[in-house]
UniProtKB/Swiss-Prot annotation:
Subunit composition and interactions: Monomer.
This enzyme's EC code(s): 3.6.5.-
Family listed: Belongs to the TRAFAC class OBG-HflX-like GTPase superfamily. OBG GTPase family.
Gene coding for it: obg
The species this protein was found in: Streptococcus equi subsp. zooepidemicus (strain MGCS10565)
Domain OBG-type G residues, every copy: 159-336
Protein name per UniProt: GTPase Obg
Disulfides per UniProt: none
Gene3D superfamilies per the UniProt record, alphabetical: GTP-binding protein OBG, C-terminal domain, GTP1/OBG domain, P-loop containing nucleotide triphosphate hydrolases
Gene Ontology cellular component list: cytoplasm
HAMAP family associated with the record: GTPase_Obg (MF_01454)
C-alpha cells in the first residue's frame, strides 16, 4: 500500500536526575559532596533511508519515545546517557510541526538526519553546587524533560520527470515501455491510483527517474478526484511531460484537455508552471490522430505571440513503440540544462531557537489569575526550572525560590496586588506567597 502522509507523536528522553551523596570513607573526615550528574536523555532523529518508498511504516506505529538518561551515581560518577532513537523515513519526506504548521525540515539526501525532538540534559549532582560558603550542599537537579511534539509527515517522491494528463491518456503505458516499472494498466479510468516510479535510460546512455502520476481531472487542485493527494508529487520534478490522447477516442478535445490540466497545475502551485513542459502527443497510431494533432498545433500557436517559443511537441505511440527514442533524448537534454526547484526557502523553516534556546525577547514568565483567585505562573523557562527542581530537598526548594526572585517574579506579583498568604500555582504545585 502506498502512503504519502502520516501524523506521528515523538517524545525525547528525559535527562537523568542528579544525585545527592556524600563521601563517607574511613580516614576521610568531612569528605564533602560526591553526587554525580544524570545522563542525557535520548533524542528522536529522522534519518533518510533510500530503501523506503512510502510512509507505510507509520500507519500503525505512530508514537515514538526515546529512553531517559540514567540517574547520577555516587563517587561523582555521571549516569549513562541514553542512545538516540533513529527513525527511518523515505527520501523526499517533509516534516511539519502539527500545531504551528511550520516546516521543520525537508529530507531529500540519502543518510540526511534531523533532530525532531531533543533529549533533556541530565540534572546536576550536589558535587556541582559546592561553594566555600556551602561546602556540603544537599542540592541536586532533576533531569530536564525531553521535547515532545506532534508532527505531520508528507512524502513527495523524488523524480526528475513527471507524467501528467487526464485519465487513460497512456501515461502508465508510456512508463512501462521506457522503463522496467510495472504500473497497473487497464482500459478504464483511474487504473493508476498511486504514483509509480521508473528509471529510464536513453540510447545515448543518459538516465533519469520518471514518475507516472494518477490521472488528473478538472477541480483536482481543489481536491476533486484524487486531487491534491497526488499533485504534491509533481512538486519535486524538474521537467513535466504533458501526455495528451490525440485520438480523441472518448470525444474529448485534445487542446481543451491541455488547457484544463495546466489550469489545475497553476491553481495548485503557481511555481509548477515554471517547470519546462514537453507535450507528448500519444496514440498517434489511431485513426484521425494526425488531423487532431494538426488542429492542436494551430490552436496552440494562436495562443502565443510571434516572439514566444512554443512548447516542444513529440508525436508518439506508446503501444506501438513509435517516436519514443527522440522523446527520451529531448527529455534528457532538457533535464541537463534545468536546475532543481527548491520547494522551501530558508524563511519557510522553523527557527532553531524553537529547539535549542530562548529568543532574546521571550518573556521569562507570565502571571494570570485563576477562577479560585490563585495566582498562576507560566512560561517555558520558568516551568523548565520548576520541573528540574528536586522538591524533596529543602535546599533545592530554597534555590528555586531565589531563582524566582532573581527573575523578578516576587516583584511582579506585588505589582499585580498579591498579598501575604495568597496561593501561587505552577502547574499542579501550590505554595503561599510571602511578602
Amino acid at each position: 500500500m502506498f502512503l504519502d502522509t502520516a501524523k506521528v507523536s515523538v517524545q525525547a528522553g528525559r535527562g537523568g536526575d542528579g544525585m545527592v551523596a556524600f563521601r563517607r570513607e574511613k580516614y576521610v573526615p568531612n569528605g564533602g559532596p560526591w553526587g554525580g550528574d544524570g545522563g542525557k536523555g535520548g533524542s528522536v532523529i529522522f534519518k533518510v533511508d533510500e530503501g523506503l518508498r512510502t510512509l507505510m511504516d507509520f500507519r500503525y506505529n505512530r508514537k515514538f519515545k526515546a529512553k531517559s538518561g540514567e540517574k547520577g551515581m555516587t563517587k561523582g560518577m555521571h549516569g549513562r546517557g541514553s542512545e538516540d532513537l533513529i527513525i527511518s523515513v523515505p527520501q523526499g519526506t517533509t516534516v511539519r510541526d502539527a500545531e504551528t504548521g511550520k516546516v521543520l525540515t525537508d529530507l531529500v539526501e540519502h543518510g540526511q538526519e534531523f533532530v525532531v525532538a531533543k533529549g533533556g540534559r541530565g540534572g546536576r549532582g550536589n558535587i556541582r553546587f559546592a561553594t566555600p560558603r556551602n561546602p556540603a550542599p544537599e542540592i541536586a537537579e532533576n533531569g530536564e524533560p525531553g521535547e515532545e511534539r506532534q508532527l505531520e509527515l508528507e512524502l513527495k517522491i523524488l523524480a526528475d520527470v513527471g507524467l501528467v494528463g487526464f485519465p487513460s491518456v497512456g501515461k502508465s503505458t508510456l512508463l512501462s515501455v521506457v522503463s522496467s516499472a510495472k504500473p497497473k494498466i487497464g482500459a478504464y479510468h483511474f487504473t493508476t491510483i498511486v504514483p509509480n516510479l521508473g528509471m529510464v535510460r536513453t540510447k545515448s546512455g543518459e538516465s533519469f527517474a520518471m514518475a507516472d502520476l494518477p490521472g488528473l481531472i478538472e477541480g483536482a487542485s481543489q481536491g476533486v478526484g484524487l486531487g491534491t493527494q497526488f499533485l504534491r508529487h509533481i512538486e519535486r520534478t524538474r521537467v513535466i511531460l504533458h501526455v495528451i490522447d490525440m485520438s480523441a477516442a472518448e470525444g474529448r478535445d485534445p487542446y481543451e484537455d491541455y488547457v484544463a490540466i495546466n489550469k489545475e497545475l497553476e491553481a495548485y502551485n503557481l511555481r509548477l508552471m515554471e517547470r519546462p513542459q514537453i507535450i507528448v502527443a500519444n496514440k498517434m497510431d489511431m485513426p484521425e490522430a494526425k488531423e487532431q494533432l494538426q488542429r492542436f498545433k494551430e490552436q496552440l500557436a494562436a495562443q502565443y505571440d510571434d516572439f514566444e517559443e512554443l512548447p516542444m511537441i513529440f508525436p508518439i505511440s506508446s503501444l506501438a513503440h513509435q517516436g519514443l527514442d527522440s522523446l527520451l533524448e529531448a527529455t534528457a537534454e532538457l533535464l541537463a540544462k534545468t536546475d532543481d526547484f527548491l520547494l522551501y526557502d530558508e524563511a519557510d523553516f522553523a527557527e532553531d531557537e524553537a529547539y535549542y534556546g530562548f529568543a532574546a525577547e521571550e518573556k521569562a514568565f507570565e502571571i494570570s489569575r485563576a477562577d479560585d483567585a490563585a495566582w498562576v505562573l507560566s512560561g517555558e523557562k520558568l516551568e523548565r526550572l520548576f520541573v528540574m527542581t528536586n522538591l524533596e530537598r529543602d535546599e533545592s526548594i530554597m534555590k528555586f525560590a531565589r531563582q524566582l526572585r532573581g527573575m523578578g517574579v516576587d516583584e511582579a506579583l506585588r505589582e499585580r496586588g498579591a498579598k501575604d498568604g495568597d496561593i501561587v500555582r505552577i502547574g499542579k504545585f501550590e505554595f503561599e506567597f510571602v511578602d
